[in-house]
Amino acid sequence: MDPRLSIIPERLRHIDKKIMVVSGKGGVGKTVISSLMALELALMEKRVGLFDLDFNGPSCHIVLGVPEHIMPVEEKGLIPPTFRKVKFMSIRYFAKERPLPLRGEDAVNAIIELLSITRWGKLDYLILDLPPGTSDEVLDIIRLIKDVYALIITTPSKLALETVSRLIQLLKILKVPILGIIENMRRGESKVYDFAKKMDVRYLGALPYDDTLEEALGDVNLLLETKVAKALINIIRSGIIENNGDEQ
Amino acid sequence: MDPRLSIIPERLRHIDKKIMVVSGKGGVGKTVISSLMALELALMEKRVGLFDLDFNGPSCHIVLGVPEHIMPVEEKGLIPPTFRKVKFMSIRYFAKERPLPLRGEDAVNAIIELLSITRWGKLDYLILDLPPGTSDEVLDIIRLIKDVYALIITTPSKLALETVSRLIQLLKILKVPILGIIENMRRGESKVYDFAKKMDVRYLGALPYDDTLEEALGDVNLLLETKVAKALINIIRSGIIENNGDEQ
Amino acid sequence: MVHEWALAESIVKTVLDIAKERKIKSVLSVEIAIGQLQQIELDILKDALNELKRGTLLEKAKFIFVEEEAEFQCRNCNNIWKFSDVKKDLKADEAEAIHFIPELAHVFIKCPRCGSPDFIVLKGRGIRISAIRGVTNGSPSFDNS
Amino acid sequence: MVHEWALAESIVKTVLDIAKERKIKSVLSVEIAIGQLQQIELDILKDALNELKRGTLLEKAKFIFVEEEAEFQCRNCNNIWKFSDVKKDLKADEAEAIHFIPELAHVFIKCPRCGSPDFIVLKGRGIRISAIRGVTNGSPSFDNS
Ligand SMILES: Nc1ncnc2c1ncn2[C@@H]1O[C@H](COP(=O)(O)OP(=O)(O)O)[C@@H](O)[C@H]1O
Ligand SMILES: Nc1ncnc2c1ncn2[C@@H]1O[C@H](COP(=O)(O)OP(=O)(O)O)[C@@H](O)[C@H]1O
Ligand SMILES: [Mg+2]
Ligand SMILES: [Mg+2]
Ligand SMILES: [Mg+2]
Ligand SMILES: [Mg+2]
Ligand code: NI
Ligand code: NI
Ligand SMILES: [Zn+2]
Ligand SMILES: [Zn+2]
């Protein structure tokens, strides 16, 4: 019998809202948006945690510019370090720049281990940055965190929308409440609005394609000044806070 | 005892060069480049197969515009349909637009099944389009296809390079010969060239960011006219054909 | 469903590989577990095996088939059910997809209790070689592989 | 390595959940398998368990620890080896990383034969509750979970 499973709800008990940032598709901006959202919620005086769950390719630390010497503190478990007011947990603390050849089963086992020993304390929001796909990590987060909400990210590309459509169908089957869809890297007219309507999911708004984003990566002050960050604030106000999702 | 494993080398015996298109990172263009490369090799009179191994989010069929009624033929196994001179295999034939909640273990089991029953026949090239991550699919293709080459795709973003660096380290440990790195969605100056040098991997060239690509998706004639396709031809001539990789 | 031929080839190839490894001169019998989920057409598989064995170390081999019921367990609600409970709900093309790739069960089958497609295939997925008997240098060898 | 406290909490919580489910009034003993890979500091774990059990159904419980050697099998070359063969090569921070997350073995340990990090942890990964004994309505209950 695995003793870790029954402690997980306990560890997350004082967190009001758990949000998994998902897409099915890679490279649509899940990590950038998760990280920015955590920073911006913290600036709105919310207590926020950010958990990078892409154990093959963690990268929230690159967006935030978390220095390498920062580490969790061991105290009756692991206490995630606070960086720019965000409690941040990542496998990168331990693996540094090394290869992470974890199979799906190993990745979720590692996630379960960290969920069972991490002491988040009281939080208003825990943002979970998921890897692409609808595989082990997504399925197990849904299984382990019964009150998790899904926030869906997509680009306007045909190559993203078919995969996102598969994901939305899956979330509906699994009865995960969906906060809505954020369209990222928008340029010109939106097809995503109609897509969201067709899929019967709330369209939360668009973030523009912004070519100043790249040089802002790793510098929180610059990041918060980008067009992407500014557009995200409105979505957070209207689409994340006080939105309890459509249980599908 | 699993009877599928010993037949796989047999099924791939008459294929000269097997190339896995990998990145670790999602959304860098693996699928677009795999598909275009297959089309262009076929136009160079090579016999080419394309196998979409992203079983959570297959999408080569969207790039190519493969109509839904096209299906493999059952004849002492499965014979992949030929589309625009490319023999094309994908889980999409069977799953259509439905969700694909396959865990890593299930995905590789499905891949093994298809590898063991698909009759590619004689080919000069088999292009394998991998999902992001360094998880089950990547590890098992390396394990099952002992003579596979890796072709690495990256964008210039910091967010791609760290993950790609992890991947390259892994490929070197596993002694997979690396054909080189293609830089995709390049704009302005390249940091990828220096990155490749530092990692001691061949830099094969760059494909420009091209905002006409999106409307060309699904239409092979338009696709072959894009700047991306044209830049890829040179890379194929100098970097794919007659390149036997650096075994690391 | 003539892809059974390909499955037969993989069985024969595997048995020959093992026979070689274990220095078996003649294979007497091969026991094959047939998982129900894959809906193998047994007659076609048998014909293919009997054709493929000619002129090989398997020439004299008897094939013994052991059918294995397919059973699932839901990861969400732990419910256990049988393929035979849900088989009738599959359309022809869905059953055929599962016939080619048993993992497509996760696309076309859901837990009858909670509706989740996230389940374990406890048994009866596909084909396995469960035993090989043969003769090495005149003496019979038994192998439970 | 004081995160053993968190592991102790999870053990106590799990045993209490099971006790409730099985209507156990008082837990007599709990058998805990301790996988070597996680390098648990057993004394700290014991102290934590003894502190946490106070005032619960586990008040009178004895904890029995069964240490399990860690063993790996390479998926590339099938080689089997033991954690104790390679432990000495780990740096302090690497061992600590594995202590927190045993799957990081795939980052810091490689097959001694072929160098692959793609291996199976055959046994000895981490903590498991292997048996609980307790009293339900006066009669002892044994459970091999
Ligand atoms: N709105 C945007 N404008 C420009 N580039 C973006 C934008 N959002 C994300 N990116 C870039 O796109 C790439 C993928 O983003 P990332 O957050 O890593 O996606 P995911 O986590 O979905 O894989 C990164 O290089 C990132 O810097
Ligand atoms: N050179 C390019 N210029 C513009 N867009 C591109 C280019 N290459 C790929 N894309 C777009 O980027 C997105 C990701 O490409 P895709 O091939 O699906 O990546 P991956 O397979 O690595 O996830 C798609 O929307 C695709 O159309
Ligand atoms: Mg990401
Ligand atoms: Mg994965
Ligand atoms: Mg792809
Ligand atoms: Mg996967
Ligand atoms: Ni068939
Ligand atoms: Ni500890
Ligand atoms: Zn169920
Ligand atoms: Zn090995």
Model-assigned labels for residue ranges:
Chain C
Residues 1-29, 36-145:
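N-terminal, polar/charged subdomain of small-to-medium soluble alpha/beta proteins
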